[in-house]
């Protein structure tokens, strides 16, 4: 009696590749590919893809030297073999953060929880360091606690204003060239000069109901369904972790 071996099955035969597309806010919208099991029975591959979060180096999206920042993109819609994503957060690499911390300077951190003009609730974290003043002889640049409080108050004020007056897409456009960071650095000069001012992290806490038309517009596409609610659309969801 001979033992018949089991037929080897290639696991990739049951899987399908999808292209990941970033919003048109970025220079390079092609992120890469992702795998998912093919639809079978009650299992839907498109449903399995929705909600996936992809972490991408910002330098790959802007084709510039932004390798120290990571962007999170969330899969919101699948059309054909293409995944349409939306901004889901941003963070610094740990080695970049460590390189900023040095001796003889004060660290200033601030964070705010703000709703954008299109109802996304974000928590934005900013970081800055004191620098030597003009004609300063002393090596250290430590600031008094009262000065640090003033600087932090100004940082919170600018973060709140910039986020609340922008849509998520507009805010992303400000984050890429660090427009907000430069505004903080400029506005705090009269209080205490700063250096290495950065928006180091952005967390998405809550998102509005899903709108296909808005997503297509974000990707530079048109749709007859623009402005209509999708059947069985998402409710406001508080994300536990990012």
Swiss-Prot record:
Transmembrane segments: none annotated. Disulfide bonds: none annotated. Belongs to the eukaryotic ribosomal protein eS1 family. It is found in: Cytoplasm. This is Small ribosomal subunit protein eS1. InterPro entries: Ribosomal_eS1 (IPR001593), Ribosomal_eS1_euk (IPR027500). It holds the Pfam family Ribosomal_S3Ae. One of its GO terms (biological process) is translation. It comes from the Eukaryota. Keywords: Cytoplasm, Ribonucleoprotein, Ribosomal protein. GO terms for molecular function: structural constituent of ribosome. The lineage of its organism: Eukaryota, Fungi, Dikarya, Ascomycota, Saccharomycotina. It comes from Lodderomyces elongisporus (strain ATCC 11503 / CBS 2605 / JCM 1781 / NBRC 1676 / NRRL YB-4239) (Yeast). GO terms for cellular component: cytosolic small ribosomal subunit. Component of the small ribosomal subunit. Mature ribosomes consist of a small (40S) and a large (60S) subunit. The 40S subunit contains about 33 different proteins and 1 molecule of RNA (18S). The 60S subunit contains about 49 different proteins and 3 molecules of RNA (25S, 5.8S and 5S).
């Amino acid at each position: 009696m001979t033992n018949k071996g089991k037929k080897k099955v290639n696991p990739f035969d049951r899987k399908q590749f999808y292209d990941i597309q970033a919003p048109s806010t970025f220079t390079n919208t092609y992120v890469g590919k992702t795998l998912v099991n093919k639809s079978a029975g009650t299992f839907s591959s498109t449903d399995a893809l929705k909600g996936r979060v992809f972490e991408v180096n910002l330098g790959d999206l802007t084709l510039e030297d932004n390798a120290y920042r990571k962007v999170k993109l969330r899969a919101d819609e699948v059309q054909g073999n293409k995944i349409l994503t939306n901004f889901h957060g941003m963070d610094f690499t740990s080695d970049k953060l460590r390189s900023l911390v040095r001796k003889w300077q004060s660290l200033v951190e601030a964070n705010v929880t703000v709703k954008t003009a299109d109802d996304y609730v974000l928590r934005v974290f900013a970081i800055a360091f004191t620098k030597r003043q003009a004609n300063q002889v002393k090596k250290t640049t430590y600031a008094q606690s009262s000065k640090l409080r003033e600087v932090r108050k100004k940082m919170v004020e600018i973060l709140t204003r910039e986020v609340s007056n922008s849509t998520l897409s507009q805010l992303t456009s400000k984050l890429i060239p660090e427009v907000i960071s430069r505004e903080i650095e400029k506005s705090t000069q009269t209080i205490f000069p700063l250096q290495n001012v950065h928006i180091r992290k952005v967390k998405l806490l809550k998102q509005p109901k899903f709108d296909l038309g808005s997503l297509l517009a974000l990707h530079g596409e048109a749709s007859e369904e623009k402005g209509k609610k999708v059947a069985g659309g998402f409710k406001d969801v508080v994300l536990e972790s990012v």
